[in-house]
C-alpha cells in the first residue's frame, strides 16, 4: 500500500452540467488508467440512465496511481459526486471521506446556486478547495468575471484557480499537480483501533452487500472479524479491493485508504451509510460522526397498470431500495387503483428516476398519483401525526392545526429577470428574506416558500421565466401552520382517493375548478353521463359533466305516432339510468396527472 503522506483523497464538486464527469474522464485518460479501447463519455457513470440524461446519480470512487513532476508516486482517490439538489446527500457522504475538493466552475456560466451549496458542504468538513475553471476553450467564456464571482461570492482566492478544458484535455495535468501540491495528506494512526467510515453501499447478487469505506484510523485485512458500530452486527471480511477503475483485490488497508469490502452481509440495513466499521476483537471507543439520516420529503402512489404485476413491483422496489438509502415504500390500497405502494423520494428528479428505472429495468407498467409532501397534523387530543397521503387526513372536526413544510430557497438570477422571479415566488406564497449582488449583474435572492408549492413545476417555470439563466438550491427548514383544506374529487358521486389533495384554502376554488375541467377533458365519454365534482368536506365547489354518447333509437320510426318515439326514448333513458348505477368509469393515467397541471389553466 502507498505511504500515508503520498495519498490524496479528493472529490469533484460543481453545479449540474458544469463538467464534473468530463473532468473525471480526462483525469482517467491523462493518468493512463483507461485504455483507448475502453474509453467512453462519463466513464464513472455506470447506470445507463445516468449516461442518457447526462447526470450523475450515484457517487463513484476510483483509485488513480500518479507519478508527479517531483518523481514521487502518489495514490489519488477520486470520489465523483452528483450535482443535482435532489442528490445533495450523496455529495455530503462523499465529502466526509476526503480532505479536499476540486470546485469546478463553468467559465461561461459562473458561480451558480448548487456551486455555493456544495462549497459550504465542503467547508463544513474543513476541506481544502482548489477552484478549477472549465470550458475555457469556448468563445463565450469570461474568465475574469468568473474569477471575480469566486472571490466575492465564495471568498476563495481565484488567483490560484486552474484554467482547463475538460473536453479537449487542456491543462488537466496542472489539475493533478495542484492536487498533489495543495491538498493535505490524510491524517490518522494506522496502529490505533480500526475506525472506517462507510460512505456508500450497494447490493451485489453474488457477494451480498458491497461496502465503500474510508479508513480513518487503524488497519483492516482480509479475514479480519469486523463489527458495525450502529447495529452491533459482526462479520468476517471475505474480500478487500479498490476500483481502478475496474475492481482489483488488495490484502489490507491502512489509515487514509479508500476501498471496498465484502463480508457476506445480507441486508443493506446492516451496513448503513455513515456507520463506523471496527474490529470485533479490539473495537474503537467511539463511532465516527456520521451523516444525518435522510428523510424522504415527496410521496406518491405507484400502482401497476396490470394488477397481476403487484408482486413483481414489490420485488423491483426492494431491489432499488438496496442501492438507494433515501428511497422508502410501503403497501397501500386505493379504491380506484387497487393494490400499490406509497413511495417516498427526496425530490421530483429522484421520483422521476425511480419511476423510469422501474419501467425500464423491470418492464412494469405504472400509474403514478400526484406527488404530495408530508404534512403535520395536531389533533384535538394534542397528538402529532405526519400525513404522507392526503386521503389519510383525519376528519376536520378532529384537527386542531394543520402544518406544512417550508423551505429556504436561494435563487441565482441575472439582474434583468429579478422582477419575474419575485412575481413567481409571490404567486407561490413565498416570503422574501434577502437579496444581495454576487456581481454587477448577478443577484442572489433568498425566499422562504411552502414546499408543496415548489414540488411540481416551480423549477420549470423559473427556467422559462428567466430564459434558462436562473439556478436554485433549497433546504427544508421547519413546519408552519397554514390555512389548508383537503380537496376531494368525486366521479359520479364517489370520491376517488388517488385524486385527493391538500391545498391552501385561498386557492382551493380555482384548483378544484381547474382539476374538474381537466378531468372532464381526459375521461373518455361513456354510454352514460359522467359527473365530475370537486368538494371540500360536504360542500361542492365545482362541477363538470360529460354528456353520454347516445344511439339514435328513433331512426327506424318513419312517421307514425309521437307516442311510439317517446316510448323508445323513455326505454333508452331507463337503460342509461341503470347503466350509470352499475357502470364503472375507467380513469386513464392522464387523469391522475390532471391534478398536477392545474396551474397552466
Curated annotation (Swiss-Prot):
Catalytic activity, reaction form: GTP + H2O = GDP + phosphate + H(+)
UniProt-listed Enzyme Commission number(s): 3.6.5.n1
Protein keywords: Cell inner membrane, Cell membrane, GTP-binding, Hydrolase, Membrane, Nucleotide-binding, Protein biosynthesis
PROSITE patterns, per database record: G_TR_1, G_TR_2
GO cellular component: plasma membrane
Matches recorded under SUPFAM superfamilies: EF-G C-terminal domain-like (SSF54980), P-loop containing nucleoside triphosphate hydrolases (SSF52540)
Residues of the tr-type G domain: 5-187
A GO BP entry: positive regulation of translation
Family matches, as InterPro entries: EF-4, EFG_III/V, EFG_V-like, EFTu-like_2, G_TR_CS, LepA_C_sf, LepA_CTD, LepA_IV
Transmembrane parts of this sequence: none
PANTHER family: TRANSLATION FACTOR GUF1 HOMOLOG, CHLOROPLASTIC, TRANSLATION FACTOR GUF1-RELATED
Protein name: Elongation factor 4
Lineage: Bacteria, Pseudomonadati, Thermodesulfobacteriota, Desulfovibrionia, Desulfovibrionales
Amino acid at each position: 500500500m502507498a505511504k500515508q503522506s503520498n495519498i490524496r483523497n479528493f472529490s469533484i464538486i460543481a453545479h449540474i452540467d458544469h463538467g464534473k464527469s468530463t473532468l473525471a474522464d480526462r483525469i482517467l485518460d491523462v493518468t493512463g488508467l483507461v485504455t483507448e479501447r475502453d474509453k467512453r463519455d462519463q466513464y464513472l457513470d455506470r447506470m445507463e440512465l445516468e449516461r442518457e440524461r447526462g447526470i450523475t446519480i450515484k457517487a463513484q470512487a476510483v483509485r488513480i496511481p500518479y507519478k508527479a513532476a517531483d518523481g514521487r508516486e502518489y495514490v489519488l482517490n477520486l470520489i465523483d459526486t452528483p450535482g443535482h439538489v435532489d442528490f445533495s446527500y450523496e455529495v455530503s457522504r462523499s465529502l466526509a471521506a476526503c480532505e479536499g475538493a476540486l470546485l469546478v466552475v463553468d467559465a461561461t456560466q459562473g458561480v451558480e446556486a448548487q456551486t455555493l451549496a456544495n462549497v459550504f458542504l465542503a467547508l463544513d468538513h474543513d476541506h481544502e478547495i482548489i477552484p478549477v475553471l472549465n470550458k475555457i476553450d469556448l468563445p463565450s467564456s469570461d474568465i475574469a468575471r468568473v474569477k471575480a464571482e469566486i472571490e466575492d461570492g465564495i471568498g476563495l482566492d481565484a488567483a490560484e484557480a486552474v484554467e482547463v478544458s475538460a473536453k479537449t484535455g487542456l491543462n488537466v495535468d496542472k489539475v493533478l499537480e495542484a492536487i498533489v501540491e495543495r491538498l493535505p495528506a490524510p491524517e490518522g494512526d494506522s496502529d490505533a483501533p480500526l475506525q472506517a467510515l462507510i460512505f456508500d453501499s450497494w447490493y451485489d447478487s453474488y457477494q451480498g452487500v458491497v461496502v465503500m469505506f474510508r479508513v480513518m484510523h487503524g488497519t483492516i485485512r482480509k479475514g479480519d472479524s469486523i463489527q458495525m458500530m450502529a447495529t452491533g452486527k459482526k462479520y468476517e471480511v471475505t474480500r478487500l479491493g479498490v476500483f481502478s477503475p475496474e475492481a482489483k483485490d488488495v490484502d489490507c488497508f491502512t489509515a487514509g485508504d479508500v476501498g471496498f469490502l465484502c463480508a457476506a452481509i445480507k441486508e443493506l440495513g446492516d451496513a448503513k451509510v455513515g456507520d463506523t466499521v471496527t474490529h470485533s476483537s479490539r473495537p474503537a471507543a467511539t463511532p465516527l460522526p456520521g451523516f444525518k439520516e435522510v428523510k424522504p420529503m415527496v410521496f406518491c402512489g405507484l400502482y401497476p397498470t396490470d394488477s397481476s404485476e403487484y408482486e413483481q413491483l414489490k420485488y423491483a422496489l426492494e431491489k432499488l431500495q438496496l442501492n438507494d438509502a433515501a428511497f422508502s415504500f410501503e403497501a397501500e390500497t386505493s379504491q380506484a387503483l387497487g393494490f400499490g405502494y406509497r413511495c417516498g423520494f427526496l425530490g421530483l428528479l429522484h421520483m422521476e428516476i425511480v419511476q423510469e428505472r422501474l419501467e425500464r429495468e423491470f418492464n412494469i407498467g405504472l400509474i403514478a398519483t400526484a406527488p404530495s409532501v408530508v404534512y403535520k397534523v395536531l389533533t384535538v387530543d394534542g397528538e402529532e401525526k405526519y400525513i404522507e397521503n392526503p386521503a389519510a387526513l383525519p376528519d376536520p372536526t378532529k384537527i386542531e392545526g394543520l402544518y406544512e413544510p417550508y423551505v429556504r430557497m436561494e435563487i441565482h438570477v441575472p439582474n434583468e429577470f429579478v422582477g419575474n422571479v419575485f412575481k413567481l415566488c409571490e404567486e407561490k406564497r413565498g416570503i422574501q428574506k434577502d437579496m444581495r449582488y454576487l456581481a454587477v449583474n448577478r443577484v442572489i435572492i433568498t425566499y422562504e416558500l411552502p414546499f408543496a408549492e415548489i414540488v411540481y413545476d416551480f423549477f420549470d417555470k423559473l427556467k422559462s421565466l428567466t430564459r434558462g439563466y436562473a439556478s436554485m438550491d433549497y433546504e427544508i427548514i421547519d413546519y408552519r401552520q397554514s390555512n389548508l383544506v383537503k380537496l376531494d374529487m368525486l366521479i359520479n358521486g364517489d370520491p376517488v382517493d388517488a385524486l385527493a389533495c391538500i391545498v391552501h384554502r385561498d386557492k382551493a376554488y380555482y384548483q378544484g375548478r381547474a382539476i374538474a375541467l381537466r378531468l372532464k377533458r381526459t375521461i373518455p365519454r361513456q354510454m352514460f353521463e359522467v359527473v365530475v365534482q370537486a368538494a371540500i368536506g360536504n360542500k361542492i365547489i365545482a362541477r363538470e359533466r360529460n354528456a353520454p354518447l347516445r344511439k339514435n333509437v328513433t331512426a327506424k320510426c318513419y312517421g307514425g305516432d309521437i307516442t311510439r318515439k317517446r316510448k323508445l326514448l323513455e326505454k333508452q333513458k331507463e337503460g342509461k339510468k341503470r347503466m350509470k348505477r352499475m357502470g364503472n368509469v375507467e380513469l386513464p393515467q392522464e387523469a391522475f396527472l390532471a391534478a398536477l397541471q392545474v396551474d397552466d389553466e
